[in-house]
């Protein structure tokens, strides 16, 4: 959205986009419910004005309010919405959820831990899989798990990598290519590998700690068995006792296909003002026309 708004800030942008035929918005569920999603809505309203025959495609993972997501993307009461078609996959993805829990519950912490007490159990999962993605919720947790795995199991050197947003782009691309070429046994990562990734060799996912949402859990599970009729396998590792309840809830939600809604932003005046200022740097606008456009 940011790059698109910069293009709209350029002089004579209407000439650039006048011949635009289609816009494909990938991973719409990630933008929906954020101010970046509002940026995308505003940019699309401009593109629809500049190109009367514009076609808009939205691609989304499973969310609870898919109809509302379509309405927000295309614009309420718009011709694009009236003439739109919603396509859903009929194939039911098989997802196998397994929990990694300690043998002795008496020593299991109740809060504030990183899950490292179950590191040996995770190594067992890694050894029995072709390639494993180990998802953590923070960069610091990602780095700690990576360091501890190499310290306790130095034989993984050269077969274990780390991937998160603070690592250089060149290194991230190298890791992604190494996964595709099946030269890595495991990758410890964050949400940086949530989206836009198709790694056929990945057999197993490990989620360290609560994923903070069923949709994200399913998204990460789908990184494994990423082919039609293949089974996705994900191991959930609770870092403390309270997350045992979350493990039970996740299994139930996956079984019942219960996914939370992504609530869109309303009345984001700060984003609107920023957008209007962007337009003033290009060719400007008339109040009445921009009101109807938005």
Model regions and ranges:
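Helicase motor core with emphasis on the C-terminal RecA-like subdomain
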Residues: 1-283, 287-294
């Amino acid at each position: 959205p940011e790059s698109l708004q910069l293009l709209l800030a350029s002089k004579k942008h209407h000439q650039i986009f006048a011949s635009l035929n289609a816009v494909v918005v990938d991973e719409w569920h990630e933008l929906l419910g954020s101010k970046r999603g509002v940026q995308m809505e505003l940019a699309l309203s401009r593109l629809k004005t500049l190109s009367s025959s514009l076609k808009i495609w939205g691609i989304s993972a499973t969310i609870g309010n898919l109809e509302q997501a379509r309405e927000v993307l295309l614009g309420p009461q718009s011709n694009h919405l009236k003439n739109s078609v919603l396509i859903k996959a009929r194939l039911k993805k098989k997802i196998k959820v397994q929990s990694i829990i300690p043998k002795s519950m008496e020593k299991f912490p109740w809060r504030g831990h990183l899950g490292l007490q179950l590191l040996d159990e995770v190594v067992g999962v890694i050894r029995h899989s072709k390639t494993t993605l180990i998802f953590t919720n923070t960069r610091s947790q990602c780095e700690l798990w990576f360091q501890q795995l190499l310290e306790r199991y130095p034989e993984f050197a050269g077969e274990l990598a780390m991937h998160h947003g603070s690592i250089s782009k060149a290194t991230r691309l190298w890791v992604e290519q190494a996964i595709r070429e099946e030269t890595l046994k495991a990758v410890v990562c964050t949400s940086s590998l949530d989206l836009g990734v198709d790694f056929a060799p990945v057999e197993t996912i490990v989620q360290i700690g609560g994923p903070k949402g069923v949709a994200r859990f399913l998204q990460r599970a789908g990184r494994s068995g990423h082919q039609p009729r293949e089974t996705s396998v994900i191991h959930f590792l609770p870092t403390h006792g309270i997350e045992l309840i979350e493990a039970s809830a996740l299994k139930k939600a996956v079984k019942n296909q219960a996914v939370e809604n992504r609530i869109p932003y309303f009345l984001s005046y700060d984003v609107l003002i920023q957008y209007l200022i962007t337009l003033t740097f290009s060719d400007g606008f008339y109040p009445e026309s921009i009101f109807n456009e938005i």
